């Protein structure tokens, strides 16, 4: 995705988007 690994953790946690997988 267009989200960075670091941002993925934060975004994910907030928006619970596709990056949530990495955050978990």
From Swiss-Prot:
Does Secreted appear among the keywords?
yes
- Entry keyword Secreted: yes
Compartments it resides in: Secreted, Cell wall
Predominantly, its location class is secreted
Secretion signal, residue range per the UniProt entry: none
Tissue expression pattern: Distributed in the epidermal cell layer of leaves and in the subepidermal layer region of stems. Not in roots.
Question: According to its UniProt entry, what is the function of this protein?
Answer: Antimicrobial peptide. Active against Fusarium spp., Gram-positive and Gram-negative bacterial pathogens.
Q: Which family does it belong to?
A: Belongs to the DEFL family. Group IV subfamily.
User: What's the protein name?
Assistant: Defensin D5
- Native organism is Spinacia oleracea
């Amino acid at each position: 995705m267009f989200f960075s690994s670091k941002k993925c953790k934060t975004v994910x946690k907030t928006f619970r988007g596709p990056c949530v997988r990495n955050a978990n």
